[in-house]
Amino acid sequence: MIKTIKKSNGTVVSFDPERLNKWASWADKRGIIWSEVTMEAMKRVYEGCTTKEMHQAMIDVCVDKQTQEYSDMAGRLLLGIIYKEAFGGFTKVPTLVTFVKNMERAGLWEKMDYSQEELEYLQGYIVHSKDISYGYAVLKQFRDKYGIRDIKTGRLFESPQFMFMGMAMKAFEKQPKHR
């Protein structure tokens, strides 16, 4: 029985099964029995595991089921990890202006010829909620192959929406200003 769990910031807290149930309930939008997923995931982790390991155990349970419904749940759970790694969670997604400046400052994106006004305009075309419609296989490919991440730690720095916008911005950067 798990009594403690280590949060992403390194603090050890008492394990609250209700939080696990909330993750599963949020990720299940196809009517599967998510409590089975949480119970099986609990069997796969150890006392003092990290929240990320617990989250991954839930994903692994879903992937092992090999049905579309469970794959969709795995995708939503993986998206939670992606947003946690990149931004600290779904509620902490930066604006495009802030994101671009941070990526350029960190040397992860090349400096592009866009004004703040243009970036603010492009912000209106980013719909982060679209990411939730991607299945597990798509998000796994994004995370493992295409998203910008730290080679040493594996930490991801962008979401699918920001990656797509960055590709479009780079492709059209040299176009006339009447974009």
Task: List the predicted regions and their residue ranges.
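Extended catalytic cores of very large enzyme megasubunits
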Residues: 1-179
